[in-house]
Amino acid sequence: MHGKILFKYGTMSSGKSLHLLATAHNFQQHSIPFLIFKSSIDDRDGKDVIHSRALGDRECISVSPTHNLYKIIAEYLDSCFLIGEETLKWILVDECQFLTEKQVEELAAIADKFGINIICYGL
């Protein structure tokens, strides 16, 4: 039960955040459980917001370089289990170039251990 990690990259203003928001919209329309992360280093549009000129704003979870992504997801999955929610299927990460090497390793562990697919968007 291994998940996949995909990396979508492009230059600035190439539509990466637009693609992330369109993907999130599609997941929401089809009731596919997902979370969105972005680095707290990117605070151009606000701390917990991803912005696209075409699709507007969407809330996300802002993570600092000291956050442990594996621990965040493990605790989230435990809470889903306790309240009977469907388990997480996808994680979308915006501005992934700002993640630490350790956080990238944590994403790989999340995909391997929990079978969650991850799409990272960045430069």
Spell out what each predicted region is.
Residues 1-79:
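Conserved P-loop
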Residues 92-93:
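Hydrophobic residues in beta-strands of the RecA-like P-loop NTPase core, especially within AAA+ ATPase
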Residues 89:
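Conserved acidic residues
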